[in-house]
Amino acid sequence: MSTKLFVLAKKNRKIKRLVQHINEDAELLQLWKCANVNAVDRGGISDHGEIHIRIVANAALKMLRLLVQGGVEPGVVKNHGLEQDDAELIVVLAACLHDIGIAVHRAHHERYSLFLAYPKARELLKGIYEEPDLTTITSEVLHAIVAHNAKEICLTIEAGVLKVADALDMTEGRSRIPFEKGRVNIHSISAQAVDSVDIEKGEKKPVKLVITLANSA
């Protein structure tokens, strides 16, 4: 089965064009596969390929939209005068590129992702943005990528939702491959314990996260 990205773009035409570019990019699709080989087959950790990308992209997009509905202003809107559609594109593209550095090595992969993501982001954004917005969007994407490291501070809402979305990809199916291979670690055990993760509109806060546990692990 061919690798494809599916994102709930709604009326965001920029995201629709981006997803088309991504699904036609053989190099990026292969980087996802290479990253997953290093993660699952060689590293014994949970899936970090196309399934992870799809989950993170859609989760980040949903949280961003809920935050905007709740009156939170994305960084690219506040600081660069761009629009919500641009912020949405940033989180989707950052999700698609944040783990490609694992194709090099899991350790310090955020920084490896940066040097792979810079030319790839600009390539994927051709026809969607012109300068100076092309460089602005690329810069925001790179910040979100490096800031998904637990030790890095997120300076934008876009980076923050990517970081949270990445952490929320922890349901039971994510750990199936390493767990069945007998590779029991924090990634497989924690994921085996989580039945579902739901992102909902909050009552007091813009976003509510509902995590259902299913295993005493």
Regions found by a protein language model. Give the residues of each.
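Short, conserved alpha-helical segments within structured domains
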Residues: A87-L89, H109, I137-V141
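Divalent metal-dependent phosphate-bond-processing catalytic cores, especially two-metal-ion Mg2+/Mn2+ enzymes
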Residues: M1-E24, L28, R42-I51, N58-D85, ...
